[in-house]
Amino acid sequence: MGEVVATLKIMPESPDVDLEALKAAIQAAMPAEAEFHKIEEEPIAFGLVALNLIFIIEDGEGGTESTEEAMAKLADVASVEITDTRRLM
């Protein structure tokens, strides 16, 4: 099997959320089977900034589910959504 790079958009609950603390929580919550790559900030509107988590996983059953579930459980997270997946060559 190969590897897949995935992008997970993480929406904070409000513009008042401490993004640096949330970034640290995201890195700490990464499942063992997922390899952290980077986090990019994406301005949305009215001061709200989404975090795009880019990570690498093995291409297999379950895929991104464990990472999605781990991020959805974090405090100050309103929603999570996979926005991109690509197979690495």
Swiss-Prot record:
<dbReference type="InterPro" id="IPR014038">
    <property type="entry name" value="EF1B_bsu/dsu_GNE"/>
</dbReference>
<dbReference type="InterPro" id="IPR014717">
    <property type="entry name" value="Transl_elong_EF1B/ribsomal_bS6"/>
</dbReference>
<dbReference type="Pfam" id="PF00736">
    <property type="entry name" value="EF1_GNE"/>
</dbReference>
<dbReference type="InterPro" id="IPR004542">
    <property type="entry name" value="Transl_elong_EF1B_B_arc"/>
</dbReference>
<dbReference type="InterPro" id="IPR036219">
    <property type="entry name" value="eEF-1beta-like_sf"/>
</dbReference>
<protein>
    <recommendedName>
        <fullName>Elongation factor 1-beta</fullName>
    </recommendedName>
</protein>
<comment type="similarity">
    <text>Belongs to the EF-1-beta/EF-1-delta family.</text>
</comment>
<dbReference type="GO" id="GO:0003746">
    <property type="term" value="F:translation elongation factor activity"/>
</dbReference>
<keyword id="KW-0251">Elongation factor</keyword>
<comment type="function">
    <text>Promotes the exchange of GDP for GTP in EF-1-alpha/GDP, thus allowing the regeneration of EF-1-alpha/GTP that could then be used to form the ternary complex EF-1-alpha/GTP/AAtRNA.</text>
</comment>
<keyword id="KW-0648">Protein biosynthesis</keyword>
